[in-house]
Structure formats: C-alpha cells, structure tokens
C-alpha cells in the first residue's frame, strides 16, 4: 500500500540523523566568550572589494563627472557645467530674475511636425510653437526681456544623444551649447543678461562638470555619456561645490554608486535615553538577609524630534566590569546581611545599544568610518530601604558616577521575530560625589554607584550627540540588506513554499482516477517515491534523508509515538458504563485524549468524534488489505511529485510533511460488527446501519466502545451516504456492498472503469481535499 512510505519515513527518521543531532547539540551549547572588537562588529564580507577608505593626501582633485543627480531648483554655484539628460520632452531648464530676463529650454522629440503647445513655466502659462523634422533631438531656447512680451525662440541644439549643458559665469551670464553635435557646428553661446542670484530650475537628471573640464563636457555632448563604472572615491563634488554650503546635522550623502550597490554616508543627531534596572533578591530565613542586589539589562522605548520628524527609538542598557561588595554583621539569623551587591567603579563600563526607525538602521550591515560624539552623563543614586521585621531599617543612599563616551561599535538585537541592527555606545565610568553609605551600618563614604536604586529621582538619563557612518547599501532603497539570522531569508523560503503549494494544489485536476487507485495499491518505498524527481540514486537518497528529518516532527509521527493506546484506554472506560446516559462521566476520558473535541451534551457525538480523531493512528499502525485515506494521500503526493522537474531539497520536506498532516481533513472510519456497521466522521457525525438493506439503526455507544478494542478500523473511502446513494440509484449486490464497506481496491477500480458517476465523484472529492 502507498501509505507504507509514511511508515518508512517515520521508522527510519530516528536512525539517519545522529550526526545532525550531534551538530544541533553543539550549536545550542552556550558559552561565555570575550570578543576582541575589530574594525567591524560583524564577521561578514561585503559583496564588493573595499579599499582602505578615506586616505589623507596633499593634492586636491576634482572628478571630471559627478552625478547623476535628481532634478533640482536652487541657486547653483557659478563656473560649473550642469549636463542635463532628460528622459521626456518638455521644459528641461528655466531661469529668471523677474525683471529683465526670462529664459527656458524646451526639448522637442525627433520627427515632430509643427504644432502649438501650452507649457507651465516659472508660474506662467505659455503658448509656443515647436517643430523638429529631423531625426535628432532638438533643445530650443525661448527668451523674453519684459514681462509683457511673448516668448520667442532664439537658439537651438540638435543632438543625437539628448544632452545639453548650462553654465553661469562669475557675472551671472548663462551659457549653453548651440548648433549641432557634429564636429564643425557645435559651439558655446552666451546670453548677456546677468542673473547672478537667480534660482536655476533643472527639470531633468543632471551631472556636474568643473569649468576646467569644458573639453570633456563638449565630448559628452558629441558622443554621449560613458557607461556607468564603479568609481574611485577621491573628493566627491556632490553639493559641496556650493561655497555657502552649511553642513546639516541629519543627512544622507551618496558617496559612490554602482549598478546594484551604493555607499551612503549617514549623519544623524541622536538623543539617547536609558533606564537602569536591578534585581533585589531577599534570602530566606527571618527576613534580615538579602542575597543579591545586581544590575540587569533593561529595554526602554521613547520618542523625540529630529529635524521636525518624530523618531521612535529603543535602548538596552547593560553593565560590565562591576565591583561586587558584601556586608555581614554577624552569624545570627537576626543579623543584617547583604551577600552580594553590585557597584559601578572606575573599572566599569556601561553599554547602551541604540536603534530607531530611521533609514540609517535599515541597512547597517557593511559599515565603515563609524564615529560618534556624545556628551557626558552624571548618574546619582537614590534611597533604598531594607525592611527588617524589627528595628530601624537600614537605608542605602547616595553614590554617583560620570559616564564618558568611550567608543561605538555595531551590534545586533535578536527578538522572537526579527534581528535588528543597532549601535552599541560604550561609556567609561568615573566615580563622583557624593559617596554612598548604608545608614546604621559601617558602610559609609564609599565611592561608586550601587545597584540598589540607580535611577534615584530620575525618570531616565539622557545623552545627546551625533553619529556618522558610511554604509554599503542596495541601490534600490526599498530593499533591506539581510543580516545574520534575519527573517529576509526565511521570507524568501516562504515565498518559494507558497509558490510550490499553489503549483502543488493546481495539479489535483490532472490526476487520473484509475491511475491513482493503481498507485495507491503499490507498496511505495523511499527510493521509488523520490526517484521521479531526479534521475540519480544519490539525489533520491538525499531527498529521502531530508524528508525523514522533517517528518519525525510532524503531527502524525508524534501521534503514533504517544497516542497509540489512547483509544483502547478510553474505550475500556466507556465499556464499563451500564447505560448510555450513565456514560456521562466517561465522556471526559474521550475528551482528555482529544485536544479538539469540547464537552457536549450529545454523548454519542462526543465519543464518536473523539474516536474518529484517533482512528487514523490505530489504522496507521495496523495492516489491512483495503485502501486507506493515507494510501490515497501518498498516491496523490507521488503523482504530483512526478510532474515536478526540480524541487528544492529544503522545500520538498515541508511539502510532504504538510501533506501528511493536512491532506483529506474530512475522514470517515467504520467498524464492522457482523451484519451491523458503525461509522464515525471527524466532523462529529455517527451512523449505524445494516449491511443487508443499508437501513440506518440506533447507534449503540456501548457496543461501539467495545468494538474499538477488538475490531479492525477501516477507512470509509466510500462513506455511508455514497453507498446508500449508489444502492438507491444503481442497485448493488450483497458481495459488492461488503467489498465496498471493506474499501476493496478491485471493486473501486471496477466502478471507476465503468465510469460510475457516484463513485467517481466521491474519489474526486477526496482528491480535492488533498490541498496544502
């Protein structure tokens, strides 16, 4: 039978992965280790070769071509060429001083007949005439010198490369290229109307070229831009070319960019707030002794404003290098004692892991040039009383440290759902006034910061400053770089699984019923099950091993191990009841072995449903000659697997395990008692009927409970409703009826070969339930 494959997967899964168990145990072992912090906090390699980063040099160089940049409207600096590369026709450049000079450039596409167009430029609606009968692009300059004039075309540039460049000289005059991009007709023209302080509007992507590199700009106009290469970091022009540029405290600067990756420098203002937490554990006895007062890691969430934007931030504070003190007044049970209490001293460090919801923390994996500046924080302890049963209460009070920023590294915070990038700020402690003491004891004038009440009267401590880092990130801003143990990889696997599930389910309509019954009767072994995927024996063995490891953790495998005898135990309890109504107390026995069935007033429904839920386990561990639901399930899996060309080794075990758990959820099982048949379903329905006439009779719960322990459990492939319908419409012999009740494969095959619509529809309904 095809379900033999499930037994083989189950029984072999406990002997194939001893080495994997050893590996898992080794991986789960936890050790306390000391990590020597290097330049990077994560031992991962970037997908490109990194150089030494920024190097100091006595020479100042300018890149001949910097960009491209997105469209911009600003008072661009003089003596630079701005090479525009528009992707659409329309206005690509405009400038005005709002008094004596208005100018804009319109890009006309090739083979454009003369027509009039309306454009919105510089807060004005303008009607112009355009014409370009040639096969090249045409940039046309439109100018007027009075607000009452109409725009007129002055000069144009014909180019095959859709490029035009603009420059403003020291006097404010605008220059651009005129003519055609052929060797003798390309020239630079200047409009002698100074606009030194006017805003220049560039409505297309543009690159920046120094005035000293005008020859290169001309070559670009003639021959087009070069292919994008991985550039060497020298001195990026960027917007640093603006002489009046003010460095913003919060900005993202693209340092270099290739096709898939770019380097971005993130500069951020930062406000770090943190809250110390502690453990105060009282020892047993009469109430005079404390076993531990210690610091513990604590998470704190807060919000603050950064450049008018609310930032949601998180911090985790922890300590290292604490000094442990103790105090004991004597050996008596009523002597006050603190076995251990933590104190931050000069040798101590405070670590604060910080992350927020800004863009900088989305791709903090491949990082260099990480630096930060933070102010000092002064922490002062409060009062903490020790409640003694009798006498005055000692009070620990005082203590102070000053936290001085000592460095920053990368760190990762792991939660149950995701791994988060973070920055770990390290603070060195320095003791300060006042000292701490415990009233009524000899503990006095000690310097440090005890863990008894580290927050004092403060809601939180706060450090302000800024950090900067250069991160290698994907060019696509919507993609987040996966980090160690990130959910991104699992999301990719889930996406593949969803696609495989969809394809797997869509194949149900292509299964021939006669082929399915024949396949269900074959004793499938592991090699024949997986050999259809790949042609090699080694691949089949690999797939079988992977499936075994996953299958041993399935619900079916767990049920076989722990619940095989559950039905027998419950049936024995019910069979001791004298009447049906007296079995109310025994219903709980059935309910105990089923975590699905709830208490119900209908005793028969409750017991029948509970039994049906467990019948699969008993049937699974028992051999019989009929067709079972698991035979059909395994046959469907095999049939669908044969239609796959290649299946991932990690996905296939998930698919087969899910199939064993989810295929055919609505099942019916029957027990035969001479001329009487008992049938129960997983939906809570129960039937009792005669084999001779299929007349329904009273369901005897006590007799049913007795049969559970001794009778063979049979999958009701053709359930009572279908058999009755078949008998009423076609008429069947007694022998056919008995064979149908026993799920005899020969009878099923004969009815299918006869194309009987009732039997065919029943099998098709079972196949449609084979979905994951």
UniProtKB/Swiss-Prot annotation:
It holds the Pfam family Rota_VP4_MID. Residues 65-225 are annotated as: Spike head. GO terms for biological process: permeabilization of host organelle membrane involved in viral entry into host cell; virion attachment to host cell. Residues 247-478 are annotated as: Spike body and stalk (antigen domain). This is Outer capsid protein VP4. Disulfide bonds: none annotated. The record marks 232-233, 242-243 as: Cleavage. Residues 509-772 are annotated as: Spike foot. Keywords: Capsid protein, Coiled coil, Hemagglutinin, Host cell membrane, Host cytoplasm, Host cytoskeleton, Host endoplasmic reticulum, Host membrane, Host-virus interaction, Membrane, Outer capsid protein, Viral attachment to host cell, Viral penetration into host cytoplasm, Viral penetration via permeabilization of host membrane, Virion, Virus entry into host cell. It comes from Rotavirus A (isolate RVA/Cow/Japan/KK3/1983/G10P8[11]) (RV-A). Residues 388-408 are annotated as: Hydrophobic. Belongs to the rotavirus VP4 family. InterPro entries: ConA-like_dom_sf, Rota_A_VP4, Rota_VP4_MID, Rota_VP4_MID_sf, VP4_concanavalin-like, VP4_helical. In group A rotaviruses, VP4 defines the P serotype. The record marks 245-246 as: Probable cleavage. GO terms for cellular component: host cell endoplasmic reticulum-Golgi intermediate compartment; host cell plasma membrane; host cell rough endoplasmic reticulum; host cytoskeleton; membrane; viral outer capsid. Residues 483-510 form a coiled coil.
